[in-house]
Amino acid sequence: MIEAEWWEYDSVDEMADAVAGDVGFIIESAIDARDASLLALPGGKTPLPVFSKLAAQKLAWKKVTIVPTDERLVEVSDERSNARLLAQSFMRAGARVIPIGGENADVEAAGNIADARLQDLPWPPDLVWLGMGGDGHTASIFTGPDMQNALDAPKARRAVGVQIGRAHV
């Protein structure tokens, strides 16, 4: 059974320091164990204070690979792209950020591209951080016409493209 812990902070800055410290420790531990670290991180505005503090840490960033936990069907250059946000946050530090296929407007093709890119990475990730949107969605998991197909996908799949029920941008 997983034990949940509740942590409260007096400010966003205090929370960002704590979370960045924890993620930095995960990265260092992975690099010590395997000489590499793989992170799956969310997009959106909420994690930006953490990303800023994390990217400023003196870590072996050249050994860190980051993928988005989810992506919109937009070009990487689009300001709504989670891969773009992650690249802006971490590439200057030296991390490698891999887009997962949002640049393809076809939902099924985008899912297949994402799965292929993720299959090429050492699995499992050292950290999977799921973001939560203002409307309560988590990691772009929305009810919609493809929800059951996603839930029934083969266990070997690392990504599935889904059409959401309504736009969440």
Describe the residue ranges of each PLM region.
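Glycine-rich N-terminal segment of FAD-binding domains in flavoprotein oxidoreductases
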Residues: 28-56
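A glycine- and small-aliphatic-rich helix-loop capping segment at beta-alpha/alpha-beta transitions
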Residues: 53-61, 84-88, 143-153
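N-terminal glycine-/serine-/threonine-rich phosphate-binding loop
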Residues: 1-39
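Ligand-binding beta-strand-loop-alpha-helix segment within the catalytic cores
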Residues: 1-3, 61-129
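Class I SAM-dependent methyltransferase SAM-binding "motif I" and its flanking Rossmann-like core
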Residues: 127, 134-166
